[in-house]
Every structure is written in C-alpha cells, then in structure tokens.
C-alpha cells in the first residue's frame, strides 16, 4: 500500500474511533445496553487462543513489534525505504491499535460504573461513616489474618504464584451467580516475565485487551497478590475504571472459598479506607490502626518497605504516563482513581450493615 493509502486508512480509523466515543457519550443507554456483553464475548474469544500458552503472549508480541519497528527504521536510514512510507506505516499501526483498543475494551471507560450496575448508593459520606467503614474492614482483616500461614517474622506466606493464579477466577465464578456484570470461565492469571521492568515503574499488574491477558507482577508484595490478580481479572470482564476494578477485586476475594484471597481482599479494603480516613482525621485513623493485629501491621510495614526500594524518577515518569491515559479516558482523577475505591467500599459496608 502506498503512503497516501495508509494515511487515508489511518484517518478513516481515527474518525471511526471518534464516532464510537461520541455515540457512547451521546446515547449511553443504547450503547451500554449491549457493549459490555459484546466486549466480554470478544475478550473470551481472544483468550481462548492466548490461553493456550502459559506465558504472557503480549510480552512476546511486544518484543517482536519492537524488533520490527527498529528493523524498518534501519531500512529508512540505509535508504532502502522512504521516510514518508515509514511514517505512514507507523501512523497506520497506531491508528489501528487505538481503534481496536476502543472497540474491544476501551469504550467501557465511558459507560456506567460498577456502583450503578450493582445498585450502590455512592455519595458524599460523613466522617463518621468513613470511620465506621474503616473499622469494619480493619476487623475483617484481623479476622482473616489469623487464617493464613505466616513465617517466623509474622509475614504472610501464600502458595506458589501458579496456584494462586488458578484459584483467582473462583471468586468471580461465585459472583456470577448473583450479579450480571460478572462471568465465570475465566482463565488463570499470568505472571509478567519482564517483572523487573514493571517493578521499577511501580506496576503490580496489567491487562492487555489485544490478547485478553490478565497479568500480575510476581514481585508484588505477597499479601497483595490475590487482590491484584482479582483486580486484573475485573478488567478481563470489561470493568475498565481503576476504582471499579479495585472494588470488584475486593468482592471477588471475599467470594472466594480460599482464606488467602479473603485476607488479601480485606487487607486491601482496609488500606484504601485507612488512606482515605487519614486525609480527614489522622487521630481516628490512628485509633483504628491500634486495633490491628500484629500480623496485619507486619504485612503493611513489609509492603511499604518492599515498594520503597523502587521509588524514583522512573516510577514518577510511569505514573505521569498512566495519569495521562486515565484522564484521556474520562477518569478525571487520573491515578488518584486508584484510591476512590474507598467510596465504593463505604457504600458496600453501609448497604450490608445498615
């Protein structure tokens, strides 16, 4: 295809992408009456292929794509390919990627949130409601902390990553019996082979819609691993917003039959609520902290120490990139949306403990 043809096709794809987003914003009741189910069906079809290999297929494809990129760039510098032809090819590749991303999964960013689909009353909460919810999740974390294996330093010890990865879909299978947004039959979570790179950027997990793979960094602190697995599986079910995925991770962990997952879910829920409470009432947050068991406190401190080693300019740059992406797809709080799961957790607490 000539350069002009690539440019024209790129323009068509970008226009179609814009039209999809515009229609989703203009008529959300129409689009999202079918899009979530369609997205899940497409992802399931893709996963039936990518799931045939135990490794993260997208990492292999990313390496091949990078090699192809540099190979074609070298051909430009050696005069075997024109710069215009190369640029038009890059433009077409990017346009195709954006179109497929939005069509397969990304359009969900403009759809209803989990609180709407589950009938939760998310609103502005009083400080007392936040305190009550934080105390509830702290007690829940204490309860399940006693049911998990611990080492000599009182830190959580979980089964191998591969075992947890197989168990992770179980919570969603249970939720699928009660709530429409969830489905069963999810494949296992995959470990990231390039985990060292992701640790440097502060990334604990990633979902790639092109291969429908939910992947988790095996370097994630132990107590967080089941929660993170369920977070990425939430994305696999067309849950796009980060705070929604965090809340779904909690629900899936608590719906699991495994206490390792239940502890991880309660652990994560407490931390999100504690962080929210600390911003408005440090005294109340400290009082609830004092009720935590030694095991929970040991895990929190160990997790903080683990992630502190990766803080730096690389992680800051990665956070800025992620922030830009989230804001581009209607998550106005950007990376802060990872903490807004507290709103959903409070709503869930109030609904079930009224």
Language-model region placement:
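N-terminal membrane topogenic signal
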Residues: 1-12
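Membrane-embedded alpha-helical segments of integral membrane proteins
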Residues: 14-75
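Active-site recognition of the HExxH zinc-binding catalytic motif
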Residues: 54, 225-246, 250-251
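Transmembrane alpha-helices and immediately adjacent membrane-cytoplasm interface residues
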Residues: 67-74, 80-116
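Membrane-interface segments at or immediately adjacent to transmembrane helices
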Residues: 108-177
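Post-HExxH zinc-binding segment in Zn-dependent metallohydrolases
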Residues: 128-133, 240-285
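Auxiliary, metal-adjacent structural segments of Zn-dependent hydrolase domains
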Residues: 152-218, 222
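Pan-zinc metallopeptidase signature
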Residues: 294-354
């Amino acid at each position: 295809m000539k350069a002009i043809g690539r440019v024209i096709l790129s323009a068509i794809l970008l226009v179609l992408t814009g039209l999809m987003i515009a229609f989703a914003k203009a008529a959300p009741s129409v689009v999202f009456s079918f899009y979530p189910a369609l997205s899940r069906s497409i992802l399931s079809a893709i996963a039936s292929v990518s799931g045939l290999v135990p490794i993260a297929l997208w990492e292999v494809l990313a390496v091949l794509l990078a090699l192809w990129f540099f190979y074609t760039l070298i051909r430009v510098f050696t005069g075997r390919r024109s710069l215009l032809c190369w640029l038009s090819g890059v433009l077409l590749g990017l346009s195709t990627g954006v179109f497929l991303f939005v069509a397969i999964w990304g359009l969900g960013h403009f759809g209803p949130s989990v609180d709407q689909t589950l009938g939760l009353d998310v609103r502005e909460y009083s400080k007392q409601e936040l305190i009550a919810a934080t105390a509830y999740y702290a007690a829940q974390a204490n309860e399940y902390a006693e049911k998990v294996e611990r080492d000599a330093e009182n830190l959580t010890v979980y089964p191998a990553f591969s075992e947890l990865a197989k168990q992770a879909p179980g919570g969603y299978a249970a939720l699928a019996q009660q709530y429409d947004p969830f489905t069963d039959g999810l494949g296992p979570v995959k470990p990231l082979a390039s985990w060292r790179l992701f640790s440097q950027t502060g990334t604990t997990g990633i979902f790639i819609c092109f291969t429908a793979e939910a992947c988790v960094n095996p370097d994630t602190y132990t107590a967080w691993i089941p929660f993170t697995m369920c977070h990425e599986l939430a994305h696999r079910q067309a849950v796009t917003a980060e705070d929604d995925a965090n809340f779904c991770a909690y629900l899936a962990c608590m719906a699991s039959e495994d206490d390792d997952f239940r502890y991880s879910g309660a652990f994560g829920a407490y931390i999100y609520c504690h962080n929210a409470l600390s911003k408005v009432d440090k005294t109340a947050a400290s009082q609830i902290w004092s009720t935590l068991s030694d095991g929970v406190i040991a895990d929190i401190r160990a997790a903080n120490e683990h992630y502190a080693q990766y803080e730096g300019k690389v992680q800051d740059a990665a956070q800025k990139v992620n922030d830009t992406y989230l804001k581009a797809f209607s998550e106005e709080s950007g990376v802060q949306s990872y903490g807004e799961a507290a709103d959903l957790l409070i709503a869930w607490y109030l609904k079930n403990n009224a």
